């Protein structure tokens, strides 16, 4: 047997090094041979452990994806399914968490061999895993965690910028590194599954969860989603979970989990493409949304789950409901007559695992026994769950676990530092940045200057449902803006006054103290925005203007005559009229994570040149939303009678401490057809005296289309370094199929005709070349 194992291992190594068709066929043959030689690895009443690890390659390439679900691999799952009882199968379809189940019920599922556990960390996960070893089938559980911007529910793990903040980097390769680093920390903590990335479209900024999105553009979201998914999945450390499928962020009135009134054509045009990209990148799981699509609950939407996601997109992983979605079909949405009906509809519609609907287990068993729920559907769901568990190596007794020391490691902090720097966006600069001389005295003012909870945003250990009593402050290194300023400007006197609270009416004494401090300083750094209570699930806002007395604070600081540098710490875009008028410089950090304050201070000092650009539009007034850039043209443009036309800050906007000049825009061919890939080229010159990185944005406009299309749609981008005084030649690939539209019959087609291809550093500075698409 040892000889056979050695042969198999060598062939696998050969396959990894030489990924040819020959090797693929050979490995399939050898896998069948392995089954014949070692049938005990498939089934039987002995422990179901694989004698040596069969490390399946990443799904980042098509052939690897195919191998991961090879017939031999599926044969193992079939044998396990054949031996499982109904009760054991349904247990695999149940996810439980300690905060939502009574202790005795939670313990019961531990002993039953529950399929998944949520919000169980470290040693607690090890204990649950040990319980699974004592069950008859010994099927390992999969542990899920909300790792939205790092393994952030664990105090001591690296907390990265929020998804919206990191999207400002427009840097897929860096975001992929962040995903891999997060996977390592989650894996080291004994967990296997991250509920990330969020692929909702953040177009209505009243919605409370905009901070969790990659912004408003499907192309950018899809690109970044694919990158972070590859980072999570490529080493088999954790499974990614794409959420929330689908249209969740577009609910009526931006109220969380309400109905979303969008057509199937709009779903295919705007909301489905990011999921398609992430599925192609190898995502193992998908989570359904709370809400409904035109009155049909997503949990019960058979067309979108079975026909579109599983059949059309070829998604082979498993679908998990969101929190208590099965029960909510009855209690909130009134879409079923009973909880049992909810269970039946959920499974029939294509959900494979129920999250925290505690009655799912008993009802599902009874429904199958009564012939009201097909065993075939149960087997399909469990197969998908087992498939993911096999792909993660959970059945392997030598499952790869990263060392605990990687949690909060220096390497991960360095990734965070780089990503946070690239996530900051310079919105305004009247020549004050970078500070030319070290100030003698700096006044740091504002309610968010020293509030790490506000800086972190949602989904950190502060909001963990089972937070340890001692977790009142971060264990790792963190920098609020105040601490960052004190660190970077160590030779300056730095004094702080809060000035006001973010919400509610603040006493005049607070305001007066801040103004007095500002009058005595050489420069004022004001840190304002929003706090955790104003962002997150169920925290939707009707008013996006600054809350409390923050606007008044900025006006009074400006009246002192001192330079005012305003730093925004906020989850999502706000209306900033007074702030812009009364600031000499304006920096957007969104929720900057551990190092948001440090990087803001470094930018102010000129230690790096900001390169971030907005992935989302800023409204001028609350009544203007949604104001995303790629809307259809209307009869009367986008103007209101009482608000200036257009957004306050456009999608793709962001300043630098240098200037870039675009010249010589060309396209490799002025006619093309479906399937062609063209090259769009431009020369970029850094005309300033500071090195920098520029995000080159490419858009298209279909000049005549069979349905309405936006006048500008993102179809490519590239981040390039340009030294001071240097000129860089930039080439952008343009896949002609990316210019397709979804017609009135919900078909994706490429309309022949005339197109404009536009390239520039922002929507306001685009240059154009012509392209004709032929039949």
Ranges and model annotations:
Residues 16, 20, 41, 53, ...:
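Ala/Thr-enriched low-complexity intrinsically disordered regions
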Residues 22, 29-30:
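Intrinsic disorder/low-complexity segments
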Residues 62-743, 747-765, 769-775:
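Glycoside hydrolase catalytic-domain context in secreted enzymes
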Residues 48-66:
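Short, Lys/Arg-enriched N-terminal segments with co-localized hydrophobic residues
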